[in-house]
Regions:
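N-proximal low-complexity "stem/linker" segments adjacent to membrane-targeting elements
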Residues: 1-27
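Short, acidic, metal-binding catalytic loop of nucleotide-sugar glycosyltransferases
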Residues: 26-37
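Short beta-strand/loop segment that forms part of the nucleotide-sugar
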Residues: 36-47, 63-66
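Acidic helix N-cap motif at the loop->helix transition within catalytic regions
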Residues: 47-56, 97, 101
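Glycine-rich, basic loop-to-helix element that forms the pyrophosphate-binding segment
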Residues: 67-84
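Short aromatic/hydrophobic "clamp" motif used to bind/position activated sugar donors
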Residues: 89
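Conserved donor NDP-sugar-binding/catalytic core segment of glycosyltransferases
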Residues: 101-130
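Conserved nucleotide-sugar donor-binding catalytic segment
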Residues: 138-196
Length: 196
């Protein structure tokens, strides 16, 4: 059997996530992107067992910490980055989901510019929308921290981490990544994408 090196490693920090993790993994399984080119790293940060989630996707790797637990999402992401095999790292929280075209849309941008981020949607436990941006809304960098939701970029592995922990860490992590991006010019305003 030929082992395929993944193109994308998706890191999910896992803390008390038994009730939400299946939905997050399902959103990865529903990607239009080739599943054999995606690895999922569950970076565990509690004492719970998550082995049964391997039944949802053959490319799941479970990373159990060898030391201190409850270190926070930042440190859990850092541990995941260390073992990731993909050239691109995707970050997803255990209580978040991606639309089916997420990886197909963002990967070319991340490959070209080093990083890609998109707008977010917030759903409750039943999958009903609590918050979503209008389809025509132009999501810009200046909106970080002002809009509710998570911001989880696709980023080249060489630019990923290390991440601190703390309040508003999704925003802080994105800002830290943006500082590393070599391209800081705007593309035309009529474009579908904006580069900081």
């Amino acid at each position: 059997m030929k082992i395929i090196t993944p193109e994308i490693s998706v890191i999910i920090p896992v803390y008390k996530a038994q009730s939400t993790l299946e939905r997050a993994i399902s959103s990865i399984n529903n990607q239009l992107y080739d599943q054999d080119k995606i690895e999922i790293i569950l970076s565990v940060d509690d004492n719970s067992k998550y082995d049964h989630f391997k039944l949802l996707n053959k490319n799941i790797r479970i990373l159990n910490p060898s030391g201190k637990l409850r270190t926070g999402a930042g440190e859990a992401r850092n541990r995941g980055i260390k073992i990731a095999r993909g050239k691109i790292i995707g970050f997803l929280d255990a209580d978040d989901t991606w639309s089916s075209n997420y990886l197909c849309e963002l990967k070319p941008i991340a490959m070209r510019y080093g990083m890609a981020i998109t707008k977010t949607e917030i759903l409750n436990q039943n999958g009903n929308y609590l918050f979503t941006l209008d389809p025509g809304y132009n999501f810009e960098i200046k909106h970080f921290g002002l809009l509710p939701g998570s911001f989880h970029p696709l980023v080249l592995k060489k630019l990923a981490g290390p991440f601190p922990d703390g309040a508003s860490q999704d925003v802080i992590h994105c800002i830290n990544l943006l500082k590393k991006i070599p391209y800081r010019s705007k593309i035309p305003s009529h474009s579908k994408y904006q580069i900081w």
